[in-house]
Amino acid sequence: YGGYRYDGRWRPIAERLAAHFGLTNGDRVLDVGCGKGFLLYELIQVVPGIEVRGLDISEYAVQNAKPEIQKNLEVGHANHLPFADKSFDLIISINTLHNLYCYDLEKAFKELERVGKKKYICVESYRNEKEKVNLLYWQLTCEIFCTPLEWQWWFEKMGYTGDHEFIYFE
């Protein structure tokens, strides 16, 4: 996270998420694996009056978050979300869940379902050996390397009801 600086790249993603999920004033959004909170910062710019929270395993990321959003972030793990059942209108987790071990991934899916009304996750995946090699070289913290079909198996096994996307390293 040391070289990860705010550059505005999350604005278009925040706009698409807000439009797709119909986010409005008063909605509550949780970002699991929020890093320094840049996406959450953009969400409060795009949807005034939205309430955002972020959770990240990195104490460094939370301590060095964008000042305008830092008070909304806390250190924690995806396998234990310290929030009440269905307390968020939307849970986002982008490029995070593949960093968990299988036993933590199972708990994380259950927690996402428990805490969120709507959910959106994006995970790294591969469709061929070239993409797998690229993923192996790029992702230093990845613990789970799954094809889209294998991720689909996880989604079904865990009863995941939210939206999902894959990112590939072509």
Language-model features: where?
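Class I (Rossmann-like) S-adenosyl-L-methionine-dependent methyltransferase catalytic domain
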Residues: Y1-F21, N25-V32, K36-P82, L100-K107, ...
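A conserved beta-strand element that flanks and buttresses the S-adenosyl-L-methionine
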Residues: I92
